Amino acid sequence: MERVFTTELQKWQTSPDRKPLVLMGARQVGKTFLLKKFATDNYENSIYLNFDKDRRLGPLLFGESLDPKVLIDKLIIHFKQNIKAGSTLIIFDEVQESPDALNSLKYFHEEANEYHVCAAGSLLGVKLLNTQGFPVGQVNIEYLYPLDFFEFLVAIQETQLLAEIKNITVISPIVEFFHAKLIDLFKIYLITGGMPEAINTYLKTRNLYQVREKQAEILNAYYLDFAKHAPKEQVMKIMQVWESIPSQLVKENKKFIYSVIRQGARANDFEMAIQWLVEADLICKTYNISVPNLPLTAYVNPEIFKLYMFDVGLYGAIAGLDPEIIIHGDELFKEFKGSLTETYVAQVLHKLNAGKIRAGLYYWTSNGRAEVDFVIQHNNKVYPLEVKSGTSSKQRSLAVYADKYNSQLVLRTSPQNLKVTGNLMNIPLYMLGNIRMLLS
């Protein structure tokens, strides 16, 4: 599968300011595959170490010395391969299992930066970011997310359709034939989500029920991660928070309420569990603001927030949503339809925020009178973004927001075509990844 992030790796490879790269992201988003393919396509050879698969590697290679010259000699002997600066990519995978290997990146940067070293790991935010062993300032940190809808189109060989929505030069409706086709494919993406194994299953079988089975396998692997890596006293709480998310989002008021998990539960019972899931890159936390001024972080109410899963396909799987209902619709599906679409939007916006300092997701409320699903910042301006899962054009909350703050432009994302009506821009859900370009 082609990943847009390959471009970032190519920039890293040729950058004069290159540091060792740490690639973070949830488990099974494709970090290992991406780095191995990048090595094959762009280097003469590669050295690959998996510290989870072979627990001896950490003590054996890094136990005595973190001197890069010593480490290079050890790697040459151990793997029986030559290592040439700039021509060999060294990959430390599951690096969270070897703090010494992670710490060695500092010395590669300071003493041997001519060597190209990438480290990848899951749960790095949980295990290592707050420890002394993390080489802050000595590495380039990047994030890999599930495949977005544009990457999905490439995977299913719909590149011509992708060109129709990537190469627009004016804000005008997409040709209706293309729009209808894109909506149909978008519904499939709502089921598959962006996990590579789920999409690969769809490519091989075109069977959405087998996709759900693959997603169940991924979810089961996450439960094993909870038990293996989380503090023992937090494991059950993490599972309870994780499993409560569909119930939280199906409410009319989607804010996270602790008593949904357990009657009488309070914030201090589950704060650590929520933070663990955030740092594991498994959920997106969306904060409430009552005033949409810059910087948005200054107007956050930290006690009021929503939680979205990081992948819309896994959300549908854990909620038990039947693929047939998503494709064809059903009266009983109405309530979940909104939460599924909002989860997709959160996934897109979360990825667009990648690498931004203290970037968060935000939504706006006004004393119970109105609520706008998301508030985004672009070029020092703030825009409200309403999410519609159906074709209804009602936007009372956007109207309240526009009147209150005299907004020149408000945004809606929905299954409707691209258009601007008055001060409202409607962005088709399938085109949301282009939102910054459209605003510019």
Task: Give the predicted meaning of each segment.
Residues 34, 38:
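Hydrophobic positions on the alpha1 helix immediately C-terminal to the Walker A/P-loop
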Residues 91, 116-122, 143:
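Structural recognition of the conserved hydrophobic beta-strand(s) that form the central parallel beta-sheet
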